[in-house]
Amino acid sequence: MNQLVVKLVKLTFKSPVHFGMKRLSDSNHTIAADTLFSALIIEALQQQLELSHLLNNLVITDLFPYNKTSYFLPKPLIRIEGKKGDESGYKAFKKLTYIPVENYSEYLRGEIDSLEASKIAESLNLGKASLSTKVSLQAVDHNGESEPYSVGNFTFYPESGLYFLAKGNADTIGQLEILMHALQYSGIGGKRSAGYGQFRCTIEDSGKFDSLLSQTGNIAILLSSAMASDEELVDCLEDARYLLKKRTGFVQSKTYADQLVKKKDFYAFSAGSTFYQKFNGKIFDVSDNGRHSVYRYAKAFWLEGKI
């Protein structure tokens, strides 16, 4: 039962989502692996399940978009040589944030031209962002009236949604399946009490990803928001191209403290960052004088490529 398998977990959303950014009125349409992992841990605790499979064996990617039959992966941070003086070509590549799985190897080889890059960007039409006005029952203005506020949300089109890849042994994947089916109803992301973030979940074989995931190459592309341990950090940074993003948020546990408390700020390499030296990453403790540990998932899920 120790053989590792990779599964594709597909989320089709039944309601708008609120994936928080800096302001409540903002909302993203994707989420990082650590947000999903926190939701899995909370659900496992509520069901009184053993956490060892999640903590020790599970490796997941960030959640990436799909549209119809196309699954997208983050654009790797590599230099693509365009035609000299072709400014429109430069802009077309700059607009790209994701690359379809079927075009990923071509992109790494520099075989996608600016026209195809523009078509890829246009194909990433996933849904619509909007603002919803809510009324706070707690906050009131100087006239004693309830204070309105705006919530950013994103509604996926029927044939679009998010997916992630999960790696683990059979027992770990079995527990993941139990937890994901429970999360369908409680939802994922912010404003779940208002019905946001509910989805239908299917778990499939990794299929069209297999050839990409099995290839070897001279560069490693990060598919999860991750951070190296102190022991790994120096070696992995040599010649790496990466973006760092700040990860923060509030502790959701009701037993951690008597009031709402923020987690320690944490910085992670963004998905799409490229390295010549792989690292494993780990799950970090970001608690800050609370009653128990608070986990921040930062394990690395890799895709190798040739450039």
Swiss-Prot record:
Iron-sulfur in keyword set: no
A GO molecular function assigned to this protein is: RNA binding
A Pfam family recorded for this sequence: RAMPs
Per UniProt, which keywords does this protein have? Antiviral defense, RNA-binding
The domain of life for this entry's organism is Bacteria
Quaternary structure, from the entry: Part of the Csm effector complex that includes Cas10, Csm2, Csm3, Csm4 and Csm5.
Q: What does this protein do?
A: CRISPR (clustered regularly interspaced short palindromic repeat) is an adaptive immune system that provides protection against mobile genetic elements (viruses, transposable elements and conjugative plasmids). CRISPR clusters contain spacers, sequences complementary to antecedent mobile elements, and target invading nucleic acids. CRISPR clusters are transcribed and processed into CRISPR RNA (crRNA). The subunit probably binds to the 5' handle of the crRNA, helping in discrimination between self- and non-self.
Q: What else is known?
A: Encoded in a type III-A CRISPR locus.
Family in the record: Belongs to the CRISPR-associated Csm4 family.
Full protein name: CRISPR system Cms protein Csm4
